[in-house]
């Protein structure tokens, strides 16, 4: 019997073949990890466009909540035109359970030589861009269409501090990294830039990508 790892190059080749066109291609930053897993397990080998949907259910279950965003990566749905919606214009946000504000403040005080960039700005600026980007809330129990309000008397006193990691990372690694530094929330841009949001922030931090090695 051949070792199972020999299937990996074939899956990777198929993955790459689906990403040739830069405009009509899937969201690599968001989908790469899960798509690779499903292809390696050979759960998405059929082609609905050719009338063969024998694996559609298994493939959909494998991709889970990423099905809508990633089905085109495995040839299950029509390719989308991403030229009008670059990955940097979309992000996934989530509140973190049991944040540690004192830890976050300690790690973000003063200059650091670590692999992240600390950005501080007024809460007013944070809220002014509240609807600039499309964000997908991971927490399904969170109420939708919640309007964030801050009393005008205190707006000038509130400052929001966020941390951008220099390098690209998966959404799972982003969540784990932000939890480990005591952040209250995180924002993961679909180009794989990770932003940890501090306790003083009212919304989900900045909607601008500022990861020095992950800007595209």
UniProtKB/Swiss-Prot annotation:
It holds the Pfam family Tsg_N. Glycans are attached at residues 52, 81, 145. It is found in: Secreted. InterPro entries: Tsg. GO terms for biological process: regulation of BMP signaling pathway. One of its GO terms (cellular component) is extracellular space. PANTHER family: TWISTED GASTRULATION PROTEIN HOMOLOG 1 (PTHR12312:SF17), TWISTED GASTRULATION PROTEIN HOMOLOG 1-A-RELATED (PTHR12312). Belongs to the twisted gastrulation protein family. Knockdown of tsg and bmp7 results in the siren phenotype with loss of posteroventral cell fates associated with decreased BMP activity. This is Twisted gastrulation protein homolog 1-A. It comes from Xenopus laevis (African clawed frog).
């Amino acid at each position: 019997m051949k070792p199972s790892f020999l299937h990996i190059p074939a899956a990777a080749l198929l993955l790459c073949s689906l990403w040739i066109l830069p405009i009509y291609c899937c969201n690599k930053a968001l989908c790469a990890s899960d798509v690779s897993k499903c292809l390696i397990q050979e759960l998405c080998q059929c082609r609905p466009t050719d009338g063969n949907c024998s694996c559609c259910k298994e493939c959909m279950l494998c991709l889970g909540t990423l099905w809508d965003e990633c089905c085109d990566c495995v040839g299950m749905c029509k390719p989308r035109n991403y030229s009008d919606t670059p990955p940097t214009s979309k992000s996934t946000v989530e509140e973190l359970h049991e944040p540690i504000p004192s830890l976050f403040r300690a790690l973000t005080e003063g200059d650091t030589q670590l692999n992240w960039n600390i950005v501080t700005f007024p809460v007013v600026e944070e809220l002014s861009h509240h609807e600039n980007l499309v964000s997908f809330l991971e927490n399904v129990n969170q109420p939708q269409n919640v309007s964030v309000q801050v009393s005008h008397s205190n707006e000038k006193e509130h400052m929001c501090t966020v941390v951008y990691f220099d390098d690209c990372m998966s959404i799972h690694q982003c969540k784990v990294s932000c939890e480990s530094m005591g952040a209250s929330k995180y924002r993961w841009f679909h180009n794989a830039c990770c932003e940890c949001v501090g306790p003083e922030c009212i919304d989900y931090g900045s909607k601008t990508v500022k990861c020095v090695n992950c800007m595209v």
